[in-house]
Amino acid sequence: VVYGESGSSLSEESPLNPINPYGASKMMSERILLDTSKIADFNCVILRYFNVAGACMQNDYTTPYTLGQRTLNATHLIKIACECAVGKRKKMGIFGTNYPTRDGTCIRDYIHVDDLANAHLASYHTLLEKNKSEIYNVGYNQGHSVKEVVEKVKEISNKDFLVEILDKRQGDPASLIANNSKILQNTPFKPLYNNLDTIIKSALDWEEHLLKFQ
């Protein structure tokens, strides 16, 4: 979100131009950390998350003791679509269909939550080893549109659900895709689940599990 409308294959050197308060707050937090590291015996790693989704791949769904997103009234696309597929929501919306993208809807880089957790560990160990502040993008360098995600959820779940076309939301960039070469080249991080089907399947399994234990 710190990149704003910057586009595809965003590197850590891409201009920062947040277009909403959330992105601006992220940028300010980064500046505070980096400024502090210049004047004190303090180093940090800043991870720029792209769109996190999915649920823990090691979940044992025979028990209620599992890891995943339990947010009420979530605003995350994959979670909302999966909630529709399992019947928790009657419908969902697509906000804008005239963006300058391949199908008119926003494009995002979705990363599985387990890979994000592993990126934290990899960057932490690299920080301990090199004792140097760094910024890393955490994504897969691949983008999927809103329409593509919704259709993939329908396909994997074998369920249809109502999708409304709504007005654009102010502050939604058309496309955000991570250039992840820096974290891949400079830390031990290696993505394990960089596949949209895998991400959505884990999210669907999670939502079905929540229905059983609510």
Language-model segments: what does each one mean?
Residues 1-53, 57-76:
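Catalytic helix-loop patch of NAD(P)-dependent Rossmann-fold dehydrogenases
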Residues 78-214:
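C-terminal substrate-binding subdomain of Rossmann-fold SDR/epimerase-dehydratase oxidoreductases
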